[in-house]
Amino acid sequence: MDQMRGHLELGYPNEACGALIGRVDAVDHEVIEFRGMRNIITDRPWDRYALDPLEQLRVQKDAESRGLEIIGFAHSHPDHPPVPSRFDADHAWSFYSYVVASVQNGVLREARSWRLDDAKAFQEEPLRVDEGAASS
């Protein structure tokens, strides 16, 4: 997803973030588009992120108006592996997919998707991306 790659690389050396918009079926999440959002963390933006709640609400309403929903979130880990941190786990909800992208020296090198299980531990998951819709 070029939109996600560009936004997460642009945020380097800080964490950048955004919403994954798409559909959920009985088995997995399908990403239709990525919406870059502002990281409102100011004291440690290089290793923390938080979304602006009002911006998140606007993105959610826009998605719902098109029959879609926020199915997860993506954020970068500057110069670190694409594995959720303890901070990530402490601030995550179980329904959503969380894409963590390793951005090394400003270049996205690897991204992996995770979801919390019932024990509040992240489990890696496959994530379907509708490349046709995502590139529009």
Where would I find each of the regions flagged by the language model?
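Conserved beta-strand-loop surface patch within small alpha/beta domains used
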Residues: 1-70, 79-136
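Conserved, mostly hydrophobic/aromatic
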Residues: 73
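Residue-level "edge-of-site" marker
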Residues: 76
